[in-house]
Amino acid sequence: VIDDQQGNAEYLVGCLNETGNKRRADNVTGLLGGPEFLAYLRAQKEPITKGFFMHVGIDDFGAINSSRGADYGNYILKSVAGCMKECLSDKQRIYHLVADQYVIVDLEASSAEEAVALKEKITDKLHNFIVDENYEAIFSISIGVIDAATFCEGTEECRKKFEFALKQAKSMGKNGFYIFSNLDY
């Protein structure tokens, strides 16, 4: 609030999504969140039969926040989101879930190779970002991928497999990449 000379409120400065409505976009990354991700999937006119969900997590993100502070951590979150967004096609979408986790949605892909290619593109983009930042923060991402048709099994089962895929990727070490398999589940 900016007051006039008499001490009365003259201007109110803020973001439009802070006016009392439930927030849709994340203030740090500018991305839509989990509820919008689910709404997008539920709005599909045809059952989802192809594509993938890519669950992305920044490895050891807590260490960045601890050593450099929350403002720098937020800068990394926004930068990672921006790098990933630049790698997407017009048919792909990205959402910020929680903390250091994102989901990339592709409902058109017909093979796992397309997820692998996107992962490589994102990894290269993030490497270039780290170099451009003079290695101030060195980090990697882990990625778990599930078939988008898993959504048709119900949101709870989809969530479990989605979380499992990222957990498996992270268990492989930094920069892990895992494509869901029922044999491991």
For each predicted feature, which ranges?
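Residue-level recognition of strand-loop junctions within catalytic nucleotide-signaling folds
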Residues: S66, V105-S110, H127, D147-A149
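Conserved long alpha-helical elements within nucleotide-processing catalytic cores of c-di-GMP signaling
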Residues: R24-F52, D59-K85, Y95-A99, I104, ...
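Sensory-module boundary signal marking interfaces of small helical input modules
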Residues: Q5, T19-K22, F61, A112, ...
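Short loop/turn elements at sensory-signaling interfaces that couple input to output
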Residues: V1-L12
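PAS-associated C-terminal
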Residues: N17-E18, V56, L107
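Cyclic nucleotide signaling catalytic output domains
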Residues: I94, K121, K125, E136, ...
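Sensory beta-sandwich core in regulatory modules of signaling proteins
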Residues: V13-G14, F53
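Output-coupling edge of small sensory domains
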Residues: V1-D3, N17, N128, I146
